């Protein structure tokens, strides 16, 4: 089913917290893989980033989970390490931290760690020894070729078991080793046809059809079931191909000298004809030359377009942090200040008296500001809203495949890690905050999510206890999950969501009837004590 499972994985990772004593912020979160073949989201719920600051964040990975997990592990400390953070400048600290962690992804040490997170193979000592052994084999083959190049034809034929006096063989052996292929000129060009030497293709045996994948130990060989060009082989040949190619020179060498004189005469005649033709048709030749130049220009332009439209993985090399990345939306709460940094299309929304207040802006390539930066960096946005036909968002941590313009700073690359910052002073009207990846926002609008949570957040069970926030998130994820994958992908993505309340929650609330009943029980107990039944109360306490 391509990028989707046959059945959704609805197992959820959920949790709740009450915040820190100095900054009580009840929160609940849940994450679900859904229809995707893997889970690429990550998040942070840190009630005490320091003594007066809380941090909540969501990372939506793409091309792999490694960058999202790396950010969840290291970004909190990188934020705290920023000079601006220590000076109390949280907005500047967030911007600097996003760019700092993005730059770290290009270092060799971090690339290795990302590869380990992703489970991709890394080069170890065994690999290096294997490469050294292959180099030794190559050196031995080169020495053998050099030795054979200095030998006479008779010595070569003797070495390979042929008698020079027998002349060129014309047998119909089933192996095809002694069969003469169609004559070829120098550098593999076809020579003049000789009707006296017709060789049925059925008599050339299996080696005349080239080699197939199973007989090739080269990554560049043909795939299994595909047949190569007759008499040719690309890459390193396997055992069956190498045995044939080793024996082919014994026939081609002896026959080459027999045909060389006739071929040279024919070539000279053809050259004379070409010279006469060019003298008579100078105008036509110049016109052809102009057409060829136009064709060359067109081909070069097409090659340039192909380079611009390349997407990660097309170069045959996959590198974590280059062909993978993550969105990041980070919220810091210090006192009454809420500071939100966002790069990508994850989102933070605050409920203000029941109305959705967006605290982040989705970064899409077709947006005016984003499109201008992409074009200035040498990129394009396709009709379906993708940068160079690949990524469908314009800001992210990682994705260094799109950040290779050496003439521009990091924040001006096609894909930028520089976050937008929004600040809000919290009041009594601000009830809760929602941070989630686009797996939620592609299904429901900001207001729809706020309304959904608002309708659940005050619900209590039969014992009078408020619902856990994580249970509300779980219900939201189920609400967003698509019934199948037959649509446009909406509801089929990974989903991660966090709800943070700005005020403490009363976990138990006395209902009028239950309060009256408890008051009556207390009065009856006091009356019993006055009547000398204190032993019963003591027994209960014991």
Curated annotation (Swiss-Prot):
Gene3D superfamilies: PPM-type phosphatase domain
EC number, as in UniProt: 3.1.3.16
One example GO MF annotation: metal ion binding
Topology versus the membrane: Lipid-anchor
Lipid-substituted positions (N-myristoyl glycine): 2
SUPFAM superfamilies per UniProt: PP2C-like
Keyword presence, Acetylation: yes
SMART domains: PP2Cc
Compartment(s) of residence: Cytoplasm; Membrane
Transmembrane segments: none
Domain PPM-type phosphatase: 26-502
Record-given protein name: Protein phosphatase 1G
Originating organism: Rattus norvegicus
Lineage summary: Eukaryota, Metazoa, Chordata, Craniata, Vertebrata
